[in-house]
Design a protein with these regions (language model features):
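Alpha-helical transmembrane segments and immediately membrane-proximal extracytoplasmic
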Residues: 1-448, 452-458, 462-474, 484-486, ...
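Generic long, charged, amphipathic alpha-helical segments
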Residues: 357-379, 508-529, 533-536, 543
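Short hydrophobic beta-strand motif reused across regulatory alpha/beta modules
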Residues: 391, 497-505, 563-571
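Bateman (tandem CBS) regulatory domains
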Residues: 447-461, 466-473, 504, 516-528, ...
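Short beta-to-alpha loop/turn elements within the nucleotide-binding domains of ABC transporters
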Residues: 449, 466, 500, 535, ...
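The conserved cystathionine-beta-synthase
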Residues: 462-483, 490, 507-512, 530-557, ...
Length: 592
């Protein structure tokens, strides 16, 4: 009998990373994806400005328009209502994938859609977002741009023969390019892709995403501008206990994140109880947005100018309080309705407003500094991406001095949210659709352990010279050693000749055999799957699945002599052992 064994078990073939020349192909494709993402970001910004000017100022212009100091008439309440009605119609008759803030939809495409996004999403998502935001929706442009950039990356990938994992890489690359073009934060965009979208840390995905983000930052001076989006130069010199104060700000930000997320999904549940089709929900939310705009126009639209004012320390306490309350209410009500908009800018604005309020009781630092720290902490806690939020704040402002304060605040906020909430604002939506995912990256024990660590030995085997009648008697008697469904068969030298099971014996009994026929003769020269002691457990498990076998004989690589056996239960024990090591708490060193 011939043996089918792994050719990948040798240490000479093992590497830290599973990269190959496909990495270069994906990196080349990412050059195009980065360009797509950058231009998509520019297009969406212009569309938002066009709709804003047309809806509020009755001017057909693509130049950026702010609503912060607009003098709105009571009739302006109907502008967000009309915008919500149009978005609802697009969602129902165009594509329901435009609903939401973009990132959960991109995650769903990655997890269950094999990283395929429909072409119409690339059209309707930016258009619906421009209408929603341009008519006063209290959203950022980054979520829709991430979804649009991801859609373009996915569509581009579908023109080539790529695997689902490779399409995922280009989807994330397009998303990173869109975020980079808006904010000028390539490193944070790459980290966002890693912390939230890719679900892996591999050169295959990391390098193309970096390429795409760098291409986008190269386009940015011509499309958006070369300067940091929000300039900041007010970082104080922290006393030794200053980082503790930053941690306290982070804890408050974590509580704010938990409250905001809980409120969002509570309001969404109330919408679902309404006797109205979801198409009408954005229009209904538009009424609340319109009233909020009359109270504080600064809460409407993208609000990048408000973020700059908060960071610059130009917002008074009462204005920050009004902005926080109005922005939080209209954002939660509007986003829960299923309209199209982003989360990053609103989170930054609400976090910054709380930071301004905190600055009046904290012992050092201006309101702009604490607004910036609180912004990053709220972002890191709500999205559960503390590294992204930290680097994002530094790149966004161009102020490296804030790094220690930001990272401790983001870590504290992250710790609070993971302890208080089961899921983030991104994953809760997926969980409600029956999709659970985890963001914990650990070393796979199947990749670390070798077959020798889990194989059963010594092994009870049947000899090839055993007669068929004797073999049948072995399976029928149920002797003490006979407690498995299948057994290896070995020749006189101990080399594996095959595997024989109860099912085989039943089939052969029906077929009949010659009186003098042996097991070895019956097995003949058919191929048998074997493993080697030095093989990785993961490799062996993959081959067992492919061959649909439950037990594999383990042989010495050079001699072919049987030395062990691996069954499915041995593989399950590997997972059980990993869980046991995670849960065990042992004192390794004595204190005295």
């Amino acid at each position: 009998m011939k043996s089918s064994a792994s050719t990948h078990g040798s240490n000479d073939t093992l590497r830290d990373f599973t990269a190959d020349r496909r990495l270069l192909v994906l990196s080349a494709l990412a050059l195009v994806t980065g360009t797509f993402g950058a231009w998509a970001a520019w297009t969406l910004l212009k569309l938002i400005a066009l709709v804003t000017n047309l809806a509020y100022y009755h001017v057909l212009s693509p130049h950026t328009a702010s609503l912060s100091h607009a003098h709105l008439a009571p009739s302006s309440i109907m502008i967000p209502v009309i915008g919500g009605l149009i978005v609802g119609l697009i969602g129902r008759y165009g594509s329901n994938k435009i609903r939401g803030h973009g990132i959960p939809e991109a995650l769903e495409a990655i997890l269950i859609g094999q990283s395929r996004i429909e072409p119409k999403v690339a059209l309707w998502k930016p258009l619906s977002s421009a209408i929603a935001i341009g008519t006063g929706g209290p959203f950022g442009a980054e979520g829709p741009i991430i979804m649009t950039g991801g859609a373009l990356g996915s569509l581009f990938a579908q023109f080539f023969r790529l695997s689902a994992a490779e399409r995922k890489t280009l989807l994330a690359a397009g998303a990173a390019a869109g975020m980079t073009a808006i904010f000028g934060t390539p490193v944070a965009a790459v980290l966002l892709a890693i912390e939230i979208m890719l679900f892996e840390w591999k050169p295959r995905s990391f390098v193309p995403v970096v390429v795409s983000a760098v291409v986008a930052i190269a386009w940015r001076p011509w499309l958006v501008g070369a300067w940091p989006l929000f300039a900041h130069r007010g970082a104080p010199v922290l006393p030794w206990w200053g980082l503790l104060v930053c941690a306290l700000v982070g804890v408050i930000a974590g509580l704010q994140s938990a409250l905001t997320t809980g409120a969002l999904y509570w309001v969404e549940e109330q919408y679902e109880k309404l006797p109205l089709h979801w198409m009408w929900w954005p229009a209904l939310a538009g009424l609340v947005v319109g009233v909020g705009g009359l109270i504080d126009p600064a809460a409407l639209g993208v609000g990048y100018d408000n973020i700059q004012a908060l960071i610059s320390g130009n917002v008074l306490m009462h204005a920050a309080l009004a902005l926080l309350i109005v922005k939080a209410i209209i954002w939660v009500v509007s986003l829960a309705s299923g309209t199209s908009g982003g989360t990053l800018a609103p989170l930054l604005m609400m976090g910054g407003a709380v930071g301004v309020l905190e600055a009046h009781v904290l012992p050092f630092g201006g309101s702009g500094f604490w607004a910036l720290i609180a912004m990053a902490a709220v972002l890191g806690g709500t999205l559960r991406c503390p590294l992204t939020a930290t680097v994002f704040a530094v790149e966004l402002t161009g102020d490296l001095r804030i790094m220690p304060a930001v990272i401790i605040a983001c870590a504290a906020s992250f710790a609070v949210t993971v302890l208080l909430m089961r899921r983030s604002i991104l994953t809760e939506r997926l969980a409600r659709r029956g999709r659970h995912l985890t963001y914990e990256y650990t070393v796979d024990p199947f990749e670390v352990m070798r077959v020798r660590d889990i194989m059963a030995h010594p092994v009870h085997a049947l000899v090839a010279s055993l007669s068929m009648t004797g073999a049948r008697a072995f399976f029928e008697t149920g002797s003490g050693v006979q407690r498995h469904r299948s057994y290896p068969v070995v020749d006189d030298a101990g080399r594996v000749a095959g595997m024989v099971s109860r099912a085989d014996m039943l089939r052969w009994s029906r077929e009949g055999w010659r009186d003098v026929e042996t097991l070895g003769e019956r097995l003949g020269s058919a191929e048998v799957l074997v493993g080697h002691p030095e093989d990785r457990v993961g490799d062996l498990a993959d081959r067992m699945i492919a061959a649909d076998v439950g037990r594999v004989p383990i042989v010495e690589r050079t001699s072919g002599v049987l030395v062990g056996l691996v069954a499915r239960r041995d593989l399950l024990r590997v997972r059980a052992l990993a869980g046991q090591l995670e849960r065990e708490r042992a004192q390794l060193m004595s204190l005295y």
